[in-house]
Amino acid sequence: MFLVNAPPLASFQTKWAPFGQTTACRIPVSFSESEEDISRATISTQVQGIISTLQSDESSLEVTVEHEGIMQKTRKGDFNIERGLKTNAAVLKGHTRESATLVVPAEFRDNKDDHSEFGPLMLESDSDDSVDRDIEEAIQEYLKKKDTGEASNEGLNTTSSTSVEHGVLLNDAQNFAAANTCPVSMVTTSDICNSFRLKEQQRSSSPVSVSSDDSFEQSIKAEIEQFLNDKKQQKSKSKISSPPKVPCIETQSKPKLKTSKTSEKQNSKQAGSELLRKHASDSKLLRPSPETTKIQPKACVLKQNTKTSSPSPKSTPIVKEEPSDSSSDDGIEEAIQLYQLEKRRQGITPTVTPEKVKSPTSANSLTHFESRKRKSLNNKLAASQDISNCQPLLSKRPVLSEEDSFSKREIGAPTTCRAETAAELMCAEAILDISKTILPSQPQSTYVIPTEPPPPPPEPQCDSDSLVDSDDSIEQEIRTFLARKAQVEGAGISPVKLETTIETSPELGSQSSKLSLTHKRKAKAMQSDLMRKTLPLDKLGSNVELNQYPQPDERLQSSGKFAAKLSAPSEIHMGAGESIVIPEVSTALNRGRGRSHGLTRSYSSGDKSSSLDSDEDLDTAIKDLLKSKRKYKKRPKDGKSQCKKRVRFDETISKPVEISEDSKQPPKDPPFIKSCLLNSSTAKENSLEKSKKRREEKAVERNIPSCSSSPQGNKDGQPMPACASNEPNSKTRALDDAHESSSVDSDDGIEQEIRKFLAERAKVSSALTAAQNEAVSDSNIEKNTQTLKQEQAVLLNPVPETALQPEPCANISTAATAQASVVQLLALHSGKQSLLPVRLFNTRPVEVRTGMSPQSTPNCFIIKKECLVEQNSIIKPIEQCLPTAPGRVITQANLNSPQNFPVAGNFVAGLKYVSGTEKQLLLNVGHTGPSKLATEICKSMVHNSRLANCPPLDRKGPALERSKELPAISIIPKSPLVRSGLYLLTTKVCKENSPSLCLPINTTAYKTGINLMSIQYCQVNTQKPPCVGELSVNQPKSAESRVSVPGHATNPPLFVTRSREFKAAREGVEREGRTNLNKAASHDLVADSVKKVKEIKNSQESKNV
C-alpha cells in the first residue's frame, strides 16, 4: 500500500512461487544484480523446485501417512495392505516413510478388523493424490516399455503387480527426475519381505531426487546383468545356513492383493518402486564397482534365504502367473531361477547384510548428500521395521523367530557404512528383482508348525487370482502340514482326506482362511461340543480331533459334515435341524468372514499360510481377536447380519414346533423382537454367558420331552426334532441364541421388562380412559349460577387454564365454588402420567351433585385441619414449621393485568417439568376471610411436635381426613371444592405480606425460581414443612377475580409431582381417620365462602374509593 504512489521501478516485482520455493527477486532496471546473485538464484531455483515438488508430494503423503498410522493402529493383521499402501506413500516420500512403515504392534491389532476392508482403498486415494496424473501416465507408459525392459527381473516375482510395480517405480523415478535438474542418488533394497520393500521405499528420499535419463534404465539393466553374473560366481562363496524357516507369506499375499487392487494403486506402488530403482541406478551410474556387485549377491542370497525360510521341494516351483510383462530379460530371469534353485538346494544364506546395499551412495551434489542422509536414517528405521515386518507375514503378527530376527537385526546394524559405492546400489537393484522372484516360492514352502497346538493350515494360494504356486506344491504343503499336525495332535487325521477337501473346495478354504483365530477357535469349540453331545464318538471320528485346533478348510468342511450328521441320524432336521445347525456352526464362521473377509483379502496369504510360532503367539492373537470381536459385536457387518438373519429365521421356524410340543414353555418370539430393537453393548456382554446357559438348559428341557412326540412332523406340518437330534438341535439353537444375545440383548429379563412396560402402558391407558369417563360424568354437575352470578360477573372472568391429566386415582366429585372456596390439596401420586393437551376453561363455580361417590386410590388424600384467615389481613404462610418437610412454592396472581393467567402450552410445559419431581404437590387455592376452608397440613403430614410454629387455630370447618387404609373419599354433596387437581391462579412469585392472593405449592425439586414463560416456581425451603399458611385476601381495586376455578369439574388440571420427601407425609396421613364431612357443614361452607368473597370485594372497592 505504501508503494502505490511510488514510481514503478521502486516497487519490487516478485514472482510468486509455490510454498517453500524461493524465487529470484529481480528489482527492475534501477537495481543491478551481480552474477553471483544470478547464479545463486538459478541454483536456489533448482533446489527449491526440488523442494517444492517434495513438499507437494509431502502434502498428500502426510495425509496418507497419518491415515496409515491410524490404519496400522486400527488394523489387526492386515500387514499386506499396510505394506503395499505404505510402499506407495513411502516411495514418493522417503523421509515420511519412517512413520508410515511402522510395524503394527500386537496391542493395536484388535482394531484392525474395523478398517481392514476399507484401509487399502482409502490409502489408494492418498497414493493417487501423491502421484500426479502425469506421473501415472508416465508410469503406465513405462510399464509398457518396462515389460520388455528392466521388469524381467521383476517378472520372476510372485505376482505381476509386484514386478510391474518395480518397473513402474523406475520409470516414475525417471519421469520425476526429468523435471528435476539435480539428480539424487537413491538406495533401494530388495523386497525380501514386503518389509524390505518397505525399507526400500522408506529410503527413497523423494521422486524428485532421481535423474530421469533413459540411460539410467539401460545402465541399471546392464548393472543388473553384471550383478547376476557376479552373483553366480559368488554363489559358492556365500554359503551360510539359512535361518529357520521364515516364510514371508505376506509377500506373496501382497502381490495378490496388488493384482486384485485397482491399477491406480499398482501404478502408484510401481512408481514408488521405480523411483527407488532410479535412485539406485543413479547412484550406480555414479559409482559402478564390481566389488560391491560381488558383495551384493551375498546380500541377495541372504535376503532370499531370509525370505525363503528353508529349501523345500514344495516351494521350489516358481510359478509365474504373470511375468509382469517384463519377459525381455530372459537371461536374467533364468539366472535368478537357477540361483534360487541352487540356493534352496544348498540352503545357503550369504552373510552380506542387505542393509549394506540399503545405505545411500554419496552423490556429488548437495541434493545427493541430503538424500543420502535422509536415506541412511530411513534405512536404519527400515532395517528394524523390515525385520519386524518380514515375520508378520508368517503369523499375521510381527513375530520373528529369534534367529531370523537376530540375523536381520545384525544385518540392519551396518546400514549406512557400506552403501557408499554404486555397486551396492546395483546389488540393491538386483536384489529387488531377485527377492521378488524368490518371494513366490517361500509362502509355498515353509510353514513353521508349532510344537503345541498347530495354527490354521496354510492355504496361501487358494484365494488370490495371482497364485504363484502350482497345484502340486499346494498339495505337498497341505500333506506335509497335515501330517505334521496329525503328529503334533496325536490324532489319526487322514491328511489325504483334508487335502482333497481343501483342493476340491478352494472357496471354502478361502472363506475359512478369512476367519480370525477367535472365530476359528469359537467354531471349533462349537463344533466339538455339538459333535460330542449330538453324535456318537464313532461318527465323530477324526473330525473332532481335527477341530481341536480347527483349520479353516477343515472347519468349514467339518461344519458341513456336522450339519449333515446332525440331520442324518433323524430326517427330522430337514427344515429346522440343518438350517439351525449349519447357521450355528456358520454363525461364528460367517461372522469371522464378515469381519475378516476384507481383512484376509488384504493379508490372505499372511492369514492362511501363516503359522504361529508358539502358543504365546496363538494366545496373544486370540486375545487381540477377542477384543476386535467385541468391537464388531457393536456394529455387525453384512456377513454377520446375514448369518443372524439366517439363524433367527431358523429359530422362528423351529420355535413353534417346540412350543407346540411343550406348551409349558412360553413363546420366545418376543426376545427376538427385542433383539431387533434393543442393543446394549454392556448388557449383551454381561448376558452372553447367562443367556447361553439359560437357553441351553431351556432348549434341552424343551426338546427332551418332545422326543416322545412323533419325529415325522407336528400339527403345523413342520418337521419335529427327534430324540437323537433334539438335544444337538437345542444345543445349536441355544448357541445361536447366545450369539444373538451377544450382539443384542435377548435375555428373559428384557422380555419381562417389556411385558411390564406394556402392562404399565395398559394401566395408564385405562386410567386415562377412566379419567375421561369421570370428566364426562362430572359434566352433569349442576351449576349454581344464581348464588354466584354477581360474583361471576365481577370476579370470575373466563381465564384460560391448563388442563393437566386428571389424576386417575382421584375420582372425587366436587363443586367448583367461586373464588371464595379455598382448597388445600395434596395430590399424592406416584405413577408416571402424560399430560393432556391444554384446555381453556371458563371458570365458573359449580356444585357437587348429591350422590356422587368419588373413588380414589390410596395415593390421594386430602389435607385436614385449617388455619383461620381473617378478612383483609395477611398471614404469611408458616415456613418455619417442619424443617424436614419439603418447602413450598408460592405463586401469586397479578390481578391488575388482563394477562394474569397465560396458562397455556408453556404453562403446561412448566407443569410437566415440575411434575418430574419426586412425589406430590400441595395446593391451596382460593381466598376467603375467616373461612372454614382455609386449610392447613399439620397432623396429617407430620407430628404435632414439629408443628410448634404453626399458629394454633380452631377448626372452623369440617376436617378432611382419611383412614389408614386410605379408602375412597366419600364427600357429602355440596362440599367445597376438594378435587385432586391443580388450580393455579397466579403467575408470579408472591412476596411475603403482598396484598394479593398467595398460592403455596409444595415441590421439592426447586431451590430457585424457574421462569417458565409467565410462571415462576419458587422453592422457599426444601426443608420447610408443607404447612400452608393463611392466604391473603386483600386485592387491589382493579383486581377482578382472576382466580381460575375450573368451571368444568370434569377436567380439573392435575399437577402431579413426585417426591420421596412426601413419603413421610403420606404415612402420616395414613394414620389419620376417614374423612367425615357433614352435609350441613358443607352447605354452610359454600355459603360462607360466597359471602366472604362478596364482602372482600365490597371492602376492597370501598378502600379503593
Swiss-Prot record:
Database matches in InterPro entries: PPP1R26, PPP1R26_N
Compositionally biased residues, Basic residues: 628-647
Superkingdom per UniProt: Eukaryota
Biased composition (Polar residues): 359-368, 504-516, 705-715
Compositionally skewed regions (Low complexity) per UniProt: 306-317, 602-612
Residue stretches spanning the membrane: none
Name the record gives this protein: Protein phosphatase 1 regulatory subunit 26
Localization of this protein: Nucleus, Nucleolus
Chief location of this protein within or outside the cell: nucleus
Organism of derivation: Xenopus laevis
Composition bias, Basic and acidic residues: 275-285, 686-701, 733-742
GO function terms (MF aspect): protein phosphatase inhibitor activity
